[in-house]
Amino acid sequence: MSDTTDSTSRFRLGDDIHFSYDNQSQPTTSESPAPSSSNKKKKKKANKKHKQPVEATLNNPEDDYPTSRVIKQAPNGDVIVESLDDEASHQNQENHRHHHQYTNIWDSASIEEQENLKSFWESLDESSKMELVKIDKKSIMEIFKNETKANNQSHHGHGANGTSSASGANSAANANPVTPSCACKYCGRRSTIIEDELENIYDNHFDDIIDFIHEIRDINDLNALPGLLFGGFHMLEEEHKLQKRQQRMKHKRDHPASQNHTENPEVHGEHPHVQPQNFVNSRAPADSINTSVVDNRTPYPVAAGSIGAKQLQHQQQLQQQLQQQQLRQLQQQLQQEQNVHSQPQQSLQMQQQLNENDLPGGNTSDLAKHLEKMSLEDKKGEYTNERKIFQKLLDPKLVEVLDKVDFEKVKSGNYVGSASQANLFQRADCLREIVRDLHKADKTQLEQGLSFLKNISSIFSNSKTPFPADVTSNPRNFSSKFNDQLSNFAEDLLKNDGNSFIEMMESLSESRTAREDLLKDPTKKDAQAWVDEDDNNDSKRPDASTVKQPSQEYEYYEESEEDEEELSEEDEDDADDNGLNEDDDLVQDGHHDDSASDTESEISEEEKMQEIRRLFLIQVIKLFQERLKSAYKEKLSEDRTQKLIEELEAEENAKKERELKKLKQKEKAKEKKRLQQLAKEEEKKKKEEEQRAKEEELKQKQEALKADQRRRKEEAKLKREEEKKKRIEELKRKEEEHKKKVEAQQKKEEEAKKLKEERKKKAEEERKKKEEEKRQKELLKKQKEEERERLKLEAEENERLEKEQQELQELQESQNQLELESAQLPAELAEEINASPDSFSPTKNHLLEQLYQARPSSVSGPTTISPPIQFTPEAVPPVAAVSSVVPSVVPISPALSGAILNGTGSPNSRNAMLYGSSAQAQLPNGLNSSTSNMSPWSSKSRLNSTSGASLQSNLFQPQLSASGFSPFNDFSTPATSAGIGSVNVNAPLASTAVEPLAGANNGGVWNPSTTSSRNNSIWSNTPNLNNASIWGNTLPSLAGGAGAGASTPSAAHTLPNSAPLASDNELIQVAAYNTFQMLQNSNQLEFGAAPLMKLFSGVKLLLGNNALTINQLLSSCDSTSVYHFEFVYDDFGTVTHVKVNFNNGGLAQSLQSQAAPTLLNNTLATSAAGLRSSPPPGLGTKASTGSVPLSQFRFNINDANSPLLSNLGDWSSGNNSTNANGNSSNGGSRGLWN
């Protein structure tokens, strides 16, 4: 192999990468090209001995790995990084492969680092410290297993050197130095035996192990733990090493020839595992073992002159030797147990073989010396055993052991051989009490206890099973010695009342102190840096008899039974692994000689337990060391990470500051540009503003001109409006003056009427007192409700009355003028009639003739006049026949009849019914006014004048129904869809289509411009007025009083011969009959029935009472009399038409039977037109209607207290009201009256 630099690199599971360099060159050989594997290994071993550790230096510290490398995985799972062109590195790597397993921070750390670890331990809190010192089974087992693997690999490497002359198969099998384990039967059997023994030890002596750990150093004292970790157990190693050295020195002085047998290790056996008696031949010299141990245990090369390095190497050697000795003793014990159970004499044979091997030539003198030496040591051992018996007797755990012993099973087993032994076990409870109170016991109790122990020892010595607490090579000799010791102990205890016992305890304490001082001296000489202040207190510790009770010692370990079981398993496994390691070291070191069996017999049970305790203590301390190391590494890693983070943050902050500076500079540049741009924009804005200012000035001038023009127009408009307002105010003022005059005149008239009415009331009060009393009670209840409605209607009616009175006043004035102008017309007509009395034809209707002649042409409207209806003389029955039936009928004056026929008497029946106050003003003066009665038949009528045309058309124009509904569809015009409550007036009276004579081109009285004589009548002759008139009395002469303004006779004056009527109902019936007759004569009937509104208007005109309501008319017509009234209803149950007949002995003679068509009679008989002949439900009947005197209706229409005032709007209002007669009217949309 060429001379190359031995450079190996290693990377292990997250640890740092370590490089080691060796500058020594390996000499090349020119021997055979294929040397044996044993020679190579010997050369490597020699090289290892001469190799000296040097300080590590890195050629390229910045490189993480070599440039040419191979990454491999070791058998234990480690990752290995090697160079490609270095073949020797692989072999050197095998020697250093497991150096991390033996590395701990205290072996390689300097004093400064140890101080850092101590300060780190002190900085931890209580919980972290408790977590670090907690015994973990898994962790301890891992430590044992790692050491076992390392020792196995090292053991197989040395075994290959010792068996180089074996067969070819064995040589090939051992050629691989890195074999992790052996597959032979003996290795497996040995491992199994060791595991079982460790389990036994752990199960039976776990408390002793823990006691020992606490005895060395109180683990619960967390502040003292660094002293334990940094040197507490090394003191134990020094003590053990000193004892072993003394024994070896004595053994070498006594047997110097035994060293010669170690030079030929290849004489006996083919395999180191097959022959256990020859395993001592394969050991290496002690110096070479120590050298290899130091080499393997030094992971990092340190400086040559360093005090810490020397101390660490020294501690490593002590630790390795201690472990190897413990494992050798454990293996010897196992072999002794196997020999005892299988062949009791095997141990003697083995001792003989060992003596033969160690003493060739049969040197009996040396053997005799050796036996004498052993006898002396046995005597010393007896003395030490006596002391141990005291300690055992005073041990507080003896009580627990006795409590756990099941004496019943012992009785049933082979231990009990006689009745005395059975009785002995029966007194076990007494023994327990004696042991518990041993410190307070007297001599008798101590004698009983000692005698009991002697008997127990005799039982176990005679039995097949040895005493479990003391297992030696010769149990029978031990039992005899034990009996002797007990006897001596009893004798010493009984002497001087126990003073000898106290002296013995003091001597034990002094010997322990001297031993501790002896151990401390060489440590201080070698290295003072490792002296711990806690070790000075070891001399003050009490003896085993004064050790704390278990309840105080094991506070940390008494959490639960499960924890103790886990801990026992951990320590068991640890002891198992460590036993394997020590066994391997035993084979490597070859520390046995021919006197091994004699030395083993000297080792007592307590010493073996001491070794086991130390072994577990070492493992526990290793566990604590690794935990503290890992915690410290984590802390360092966190600190470095935090520092790195801080550095990164600082760098990031610096970077951000630089960026901020750049941004600020950019912002400044941008701000400068922005300011320049703003300056340019401001200049531009100034120019634009100047231009805008000029444009605004022009606009303002234009607007000023426009505003001036508008102002002028507004001023002109305001002037016109002011003038118009002035004109309107003047008109209003004139109207107000006119209204005042009219109101004054009306007040006078009302006062006069009130006086008349009061007189009438006084006359009638006595007669109607009883009736009124009854009615008053009912009226009082209803008046309260009427009062409310009256107040509402009064305000509205007052406004309407003012307007209508004004209009009526103007109309009256115009009528008065017309009457004055046509005052001479009746005189002329009378003269004509008187002049030709013989020419009167009885078949002619003189009344109609007079009415037709007297009709003023000014009343006719612009509408087209229908052609005249030709009446035959037979169409009208004789008046005498009528007068014979009708008792005394009020005659109707020509003016009144003309007014009725032409519509002047009732211009609008609907308005007449709605506004009762205006109806009085619309009547002719002869019926309603006390002023001078002017004749309306003057040809110089002012009704045709332009000024009064609009007023006349508004007053006399018929008001049609809004709904346009009519059962006959003759005179109605559909206009709008109004409610049902709007009545179809059908206004035939107000219509000009029913004029009897209407020829536009014909001359006559209807044409105001005609020049024909008034004597020409429609019948071509003039009736003789000298005869009796149709009214049965002579008309008064009107010629003489025409100019003087004589008033026309009123209705009261036209009935001088008439007797008073029986009741008011009869008066209303007579008026209704006369009105029906006039409508029949004027051909205004509709299918033989008179429209209700026309009939109602005529009745009010005849009676001169505008306060009369439709309900009163219908109730009066429904009462029994000589007249028979038939009502015709529409689909809504409203009365629309009335038919009047006579009730003459059951024979009804219709006044219109000859004039009505036959089709009408058939239609009325069969009700084909949908008319009803019977009243619908809800109409007033005879039973519900009382007779009301006529005087009840003669009230002033302007009187607010009139009981009939509320009945004026019954048919048009929708409110429930009650009239003066007690008739209820709900005002619904179904009918005009109910």
UniProtKB/Swiss-Prot annotation:
Residues 39-51 have a biased composition (Basic residues). Residues 1-10, 21-31 have a biased composition (Polar residues). The keyword Kinase does not apply. It is found in: Cytoplasm. Residues 1-70, 149-175, 246-283, 513-608, 661-816, 924-945, 1214-1234 are annotated as: Disordered. It comes from the Eukaryota. GO terms for cellular component: cytoplasm. Pfam families: NST1 (PF13945). Residues 161-175, 929-941, 1214-1227 have a biased composition (Low complexity). InterPro entries: NST1. Residues 263-273, 513-527, 661-670, 679-806 have a biased composition (Basic and acidic residues). Keywords: Coiled coil, Cytoplasm, Stress response. May act as a negative regulator of salt tolerance. This is Stress response protein NST1. It comes from Scheffersomyces stipitis (strain ATCC 58785 / CBS 6054 / NBRC 10063 / NRRL Y-11545) (Yeast).
